């Protein structure tokens, strides 16, 4: 009885495999299968309506004509089709395909495109400030590779804009953490985070906030002398900031305070 069941399963699996093989064989007629260009164009027909079927054609180009001009285009088309589907799983597959393309064809005219799109794979799935920023960091790394490896390309220009956006997001994230420490009266931790913004993200658009809360962290930490440069910077460079008046009030408060007696 057991032998009969096993035999039945083997026959069943064989029929399924034969069926799948027949479908693959029937995927492209001989006149298409014998041409790299025809296979590629056949794949293009299905990219939007049946991306999985399109990828079968593209992979047939890659496997059957590995040194063809269309093999490189097919490799990118596979990556782009995964990217276009947009969900987490397909974006991971897209990133893998782009990375492999760059590894195989580093001097290809399409390499800058693949590198930039690799950055987008992480950028498009990155979280808002206040949440895990690992994907933003990965995106920033890949965009920086774009401008380093391909500095004169259009993709480098696009990457520079994305770098600014990534750094703005990371700065805002760091500020959110610093503000949390400030409100928790953990002033040593808040100053550390806020100084990190000054050091790593000097173009952050919320720099007036950084100067105020950095100054006020030192002020509340009983280090008023260290707060003066930051309050002064805020008042001088951002006079229209909503925090400028508070910074000015702090400076007056520090000025009126009796000098601290130093021990001899």
Language model features with spans:
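Acidic, polar-rich low-complexity tracts and alpha-helical solenoid repeat scaffolds
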Residues: 2-5, 18-264
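Bacterial N-terminal signal peptides
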Residues: 8-16
